[in-house]
């Protein structure tokens, strides 16, 4: 009875969402999470590999599409505006994840999209003064130097 309040449970119940298992795994730095039923009887375990697979499925890591990461102040975060910009470019947000950088307290907003070509979307975010810290996808636009170089080479071939 004396130690009852000093120990925290390092298990999840079978009815809990898998994110609770991820939280327990991180808190106790363990790769195996016990799963108990309503009577607190052990019904199984969840291993680190199973958690990683579940996190991959949950985050859409296996889905095809571009990823854009924005950085902003918490007070500037507006999901409806971000969604409006994305949808105005003909894209759909498949997954959106928000983390806070401990050093800067800025939000990192990671957006997983349903399309790969994102050059116009990158330009739209820049037009609305969003700070883009990362993106991966296909870009179809060319910069002026490439265009001018190609025109010069075509001219010299004539």
Outline where the language-model segments fall.
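Bateman/CBS regulatory modules and CBS-like beta-alpha motifs in cytosolic regions of diverse proteins
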Residues: 1-30, 35-38, 42-43, 62-63, ...
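Residue-level signal for the start and early helices of compact helical domains
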Residues: 3, 9, 27, 37, ...
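Short N-terminal helix-initiation segments at or just after the protein's N-terminus
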Residues: 6-17, 50-59, 143-152
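A conserved hydrophobic position in a structured secondary element of the catalytic/binding core
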Residues: 13, 46-47, 113
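Short hydrophobic beta-strand motif reused across regulatory alpha/beta modules
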Residues: 43-51
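A conserved regulatory-domain signal marking ACT and ACT-like small-molecule sensing domains
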Residues: 55, 65-158
């Amino acid at each position: 009875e004396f130690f009852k309040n000093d120990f925290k449970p390092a298990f999840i119940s079978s009815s809990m969402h898998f994110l609770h298992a991820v939280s327990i795994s991180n808190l106790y730095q363990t790769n195996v999470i016990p799963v108990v039923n309503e009577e607190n009887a052990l019904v199984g375990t969840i291993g680190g590999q199973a958690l990683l697979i579940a996190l991959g499925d949950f985050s859409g890591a296996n889905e095809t599409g571009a990823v854009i990461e924005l950085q902003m102040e918490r007070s500037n975060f507006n999901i409806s505006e971000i969604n409006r910009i994305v949808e105005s470019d003909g894209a759909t947000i498949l997954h959106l994840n928000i983390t806070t950088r401990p050093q800067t307290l800025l939000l990192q907003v990671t957006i997983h999209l349903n399309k790969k070509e994102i050059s116009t979307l990158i330009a739209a975010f820049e037009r609305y003064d969003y700070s883009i810290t990362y993106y991966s996808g296909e870009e179809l636009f060319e910069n002026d130097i490439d265009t001018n170089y190609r025109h010069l080479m075509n001219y010299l071939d004539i």
